[in-house]
Amino acid sequence: MARVKRGVIARARHKKVLKAAKGYYGARSRVYRVAFQAVIKAGQYAYRDRRQRKRQFRQLWIARINAAARQNGLSYSKFINGLKKVSVEIDRKILADIAVFDKVAFAALVEKAKSAL
C-alpha cells in the first residue's frame, strides 16, 4: 500500500485555525496550539452570547418601558396588565422604542392602560 503523506492536510487545517484567530493578541494569533484553544473558546462564547443577547435586549426594553411608565405614574407590571386588558398587542421592543422616541404616544398608551385598571 502506498504511503500517505498528510502535510497538505495539516497545513490546511493549521491555516484555517490561524485565519480564524487573526486579530487575537500575542501567541493566540501565531501559535497553532494556543490559537486552536482560543478559537474553540471564542466559539463557545459566541454560542452562549447569541442566546444571552436575546435576554439582555428584553431586559433593556423592560427597563426602558418601566422608566417611561413610572414617569407617567404607573408601574411596569400594571402598565402591561392594563395593555393586555384593553387588548393592545404591541411587543416590548416596539413599546421601548415608542417610550424613547415618541413620549406623547407613550403617554397615550399609559392613559389607555390606566382606564382599564
UniProtKB/Swiss-Prot annotation:
GO biological process: ribosomal large subunit assembly; translation
A Pfam match: Ribosomal_L20
Keywords: Ribonucleoprotein, Ribosomal protein, RNA-binding, rRNA-binding
Any one GO molecular function term: rRNA binding
GO cellular component annotations of the record: ribonucleoprotein complex; ribosome
SUPFAM superfamilies assigned: Ribosomal protein L20
Keyword RNA-binding found: yes
InterPro entries, per database record: Ribosomal_bL20 (IPR005813), RIBOSOMAL_L20_CS (IPR049946), Ribosomal_protein_bL20_C (IPR035566)
Top-rank taxon, per record: Bacteria
Task of the protein: Binds directly to 23S ribosomal RNA and is necessary for the in vitro assembly process of the 50S ribosomal subunit. It is not involved in the protein synthesizing functions of that subunit.
Entry-linked HAMAP family: Ribosomal_bL20 (MF_00382)
PANTHER family with a match to the protein in the record: 39S RIBOSOMAL PROTEIN L20
Family from the record: Belongs to the bacterial ribosomal protein bL20 family.
Protein name: Large ribosomal subunit protein bL20
Gene that this sequence comes from: rplT
